[in-house]
From Swiss-Prot:
Domain spans labelled MsrB: 9-133
This protein's name: Uncharacterized protein C216.04c
InterPro entries attached to this UniProt entry: Met_Sox_Rdtase_MsrB, Met_Sox_Rdtase_MsrB_dom, Mss4-like_sf
GO biological process: cellular detoxification; cellular response to oxidative stress; protein repair
Active site: 122
Residues where Zn(2+) binds: 49, 52, 97, 100
Pfam families (UniProt xref): SelR (PF01641)
Amino acid sequence: MGFPLEKSEDEWKKELGPEKYRIMRQKGTEHPGAGRFTHQFPKQGVFVCAACKELLYKASTKFESHCGWPAFFDNLPGKVKRIEDNSYGMHRVEAVCANCGGHLGHIFKGEGYSNPTDERHCINSASLEFHNEATNDN
């Protein structure tokens, strides 16, 4: 599957380090509650892809879901690609960075959260960086 930013796995391994590589390139996950962004709720700013720095989520779309991972109800337009994921005997939708293909987490719909999309983007903190400064996209 092609993405605008492509690198060899050796390049990704070197740039990301072991934990981010495991999560972002090997589709791993963090332990629930272990991520640095799980309990942070900034009012402004953006969350970007930890691998390629692509803007992904406005801080204003982050919400408390009590699931153990950072949760967002929507991504910036065109920034997160949805891929059907039937691994581990489950039907889920994987969220990946539309620029580099890095694994972010999964997207769940119809869980009854009172947000504008009724979606929960359950995202690994290791897949994100936070930028507090305002941008044209937030």
